[in-house]
Amino acid sequence: MRLFRQLSIQWKITILSFGIVAFALMMVSISLLGYVTSIKEDELSNRTMITAQLVAQNHTVQQWVDAKPEEASRTLQPIVERIRVINDHDYIVLLNMDRIRITHPIPERLQTPFVGGDEDPAFAEHIYLSKAKTEGVVTVRAFMPILNQQREQVGVAVVGSVLPSYADMIQEFWQPALLIGLITALFGFWGSWLLASHIKRQTFNMEPDELAHLLVERDASFNAIHEGVVAINKHEKITIMNEAARRMLGVKEKAIGRNIHEVIPDTKLPEILSIGKPLYQREFYIQGRLVFSNRIPIQIDGETVGAIAIFQDKSDVDRLAEELTGVQAFVDALRVQNHEYSNKLHTIAGLIQLDEGKKALQYIFDLEEEQEEFSGVVMQKIHNDSLAGLLLGKVSRGKELGVQVIIEKDSEFIDHPEGVTTHDLVVIVGNLIDNSLDAFSSTQDQNKTVHVFIGEENDFLKIRVRDNGEGIREEVREKMFVRGFSTKSTSGRGIGLFLIQAIVERVEGKIEVESELNIGTTFSIYLPKKRG
């Protein structure tokens, strides 16, 4: 046993597999031996019965079997012996009605009483087979009544054949059986070795103790990672879940080996198995915490055999958070507003120097009315300081670019939809307005307008941004939501629509895009007030 434990896994598998093959071969051989013996017995039984019928129907036998025993034996013994030899039976015995042997292969037993104990039914004209063990062998015997021409019973024909034993069958078939056994054993050993070699290659030629050590190292490495890591196999069973993932997902019970839907009901990791492509920086909420995930398929030889997800907390991705909050957009808005009011102050100062005080005062009133009209819509209808500030900044930015950004008067924002944060709204509105402003970069039209609507429609918060810019070409529409795709050559572009789509998908909303070249584009975002 100690020697067996010291063998490599390849030799262990080979020996075990070959042992199973050898055991199966032995069981099959025993079963086959019994089956062949049974067939042989059936064959002998049929032959014995046919011969008994042939003897009983012989006219000479019918005429002489009830004669005097001495005369009957002299007449019938040669005839019956010839039939016995030809048909290869061990004995044929004819009995008269006094149960005296008229014929027998052993002459000393002629004219002696039959001793068997199973012949009574035959003297009542019954036809049957029986088995008897005599002198250490088992014989099958056919009993056939002998009837004369008047259909009267005059005797009984008994035909017996010795049944072959298992030893006889082995002796008869040992040569072909040995040849088949050797060939089977050879192929069994060869197949076992191939199987063991295949398993060895599948385990990267590593022994079980090496695999166990590697598994321990892997678990330690994953648990040392600050990000949450979850991996599944192609059957959607969890194979990896480190401690960080347990904390983020709030999982306390055993997770390894369970279906991921049982542990994380709203998971989207299994979809990676079907699409076979990675998804980066997708956001969603876990236990009230906004996280980002990278989901990557695990592929071997081009086949997807699993998927792995890496979760990152929002606080760990400051760079992406800065893109979401639109800090740069507010800085630009302040710069534009400073420049705009500087020009207005210069105008007022000039009117005062020209002693046009009434005109200066009227100019101030006009500015105040214009500002109140615009600010009234934004500040009174948009009950979110960050979103209102963003809209004011975008209006100012539009003026700098010669584009009129119009906040529609029927806009109204009161409360966030379920699962949508202020950052999400800033990302959606800010990027849509920026895209509309960019749509005028190559147009010479003087009437450049962008209409923005934010309000409730049925059970959705609707965000609509409509411009009369250059429109979107068909080839661009097919790829505009892909991360990194942009029609601009500026570095860092191509993330806005990708982020919008990620937010909308997370809250199970929808995006509608209508665009015609040289006419304009309309983006409509629908965010459900309540999910589910």
Curated annotation (Swiss-Prot):
What would you give as a GO molecular function for this chain, any one? ATP binding
Q: Where are the transmembrane segments?
A: 13-33, 176-196
Any one of the GO CC terms:
plasma membrane
The PAS domain covers: 216-279
Cellular compartments annotated: Cell membrane
Judged by the first EC level, this protein's enzyme class is transferase
Catalyzed reactions: ATP + protein L-histidine = ADP + protein N-phospho-L-histidine
Regarding the membrane, this protein is recorded as: Multi-pass membrane protein
Cytoplasmic compartment: which residues? 1-12, 197-532
Show where the Histidine kinase domain sits. Answer: 315-531
Q: Which InterPro entries match?
A: HATPase_C_sf (IPR036890), His_kinase_dom (IPR005467), PAS (IPR000014), PAS-like_dom_sf (IPR035965), PAS_fold (IPR013767), sCache_3 (IPR033463), Sensor-like_sf (IPR029151), Sig_transdc_His_kin-like_C (IPR004358)
Q: Which residues lie on this side of the membrane: Extracellular?
A: 34-175
- What biological function has been recorded for the protein in this entry? Member of the two-component regulatory system DctS/DctR. Probably activates DctR by phosphorylation. Essential for expression of dctP.
Q: What is this protein called?
A: Probable C4-dicarboxylate sensor kinase
Q: What is the lineage of its organism?
A: Bacteria, Bacillati, Bacillota, Bacilli, Bacillales
